[in-house]
Structure formats: C-alpha cells, structure tokens
Amino acid sequence: EYAQIINDQSKRHMTLRGLFEFKLDPAQAIPLSEVEPATNIVKRFATGAMSLGSISTEAHTTLAIAMNRIGGKSNTGEGGEDPMRYRQELRAGGSVIETGATLSGVLGRDRVEVDTPLRAGDSLRSKIKQVASARFGVTTEYLNSADQLQIKMAQGAKPGEGGQLPGHKVSTYIAE
C-alpha cells in the first residue's frame, strides 16, 4: 500500500513524469538483434566535472576507474589531476596496474585516506581534462593525457565565485 501511494504521488502532483505513460504494442517490438548493445551505449557516458578538491581522492579516482572499466569517460573538473594517475600509463602505452595493486600503492599513502584494491588493467586516468580560467593543475603533460578537452567558459553553479574551495579542503596534496 505504501509503495502504491509513493508511486502514484507523481500523478497526484500533476508532474510531467506522472502524466507520462507508455503504450506498448508487443506486435511492434524491435527485435533485440536490432538494438544497440550496451557496450556501445556506455561509450557515450560521462561523469560531471568535479574537481579533486571538491570531493575526495578516493571518490575522484573511483569515478575514473568505474568509467574506464565500462568504456565511458570521467571528467577531472577544474582542479587538474594527479600526474601519478596518468604518467606511467602514458609512458607504457596502457595500464600498468597489476593484480594486488592498491590506490595508495599507486598514489602514495600520504594521498589516500581509505585504500582501495585495484584490478589488473585498471586505469586511474580521467579521459576528459577540464581547463578553466585559473588553469589550476594545467600543464602540457596534463593536456597531452586527455582524450577530450573541456574548456570551461563560465561558472554555472556559483556565477562569479567559481573555483573557490573552503579552506579546510585545501590540503598540501590539493595545493600541489
């Protein structure tokens, strides 16, 4: 009964979602063989741009790992990216992560609060590199490690105030 009340809430509030219904005709179903495979669809998935300083090393890296595993793209945000996440991979021409590796083993214990086990072949590299007006963390090497560049022209969330982190979030690691 509770689930029904919650599920009908959109209809009662007259939201667009609540007024939308699918009319299915099994006779007009598209054969599964004509549907684009999920492995192709996820290649167009991308995370939002969130800087390393705005979240955590673990969260920022986990987004990159997850998107790389499915074939999508993560975005560095305007704070740049730790060169340890892409330098070795670029030099080797592919992932250098081996079985038994951990996040702190790659980045260093002083840069990780909660260690994360990695899989062989994982990539910590964000494929989308954002460049903002202050160019935090932007180097030639950083730009060369991108599959895609995103040039930020304006601040949407806090117009006129972008790129300012609360003081307690600016650690030595973030300041680098």
Model-derived segments and spans:
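Conserved, well-structured core domains of diverse proteins
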Residues: 1-176
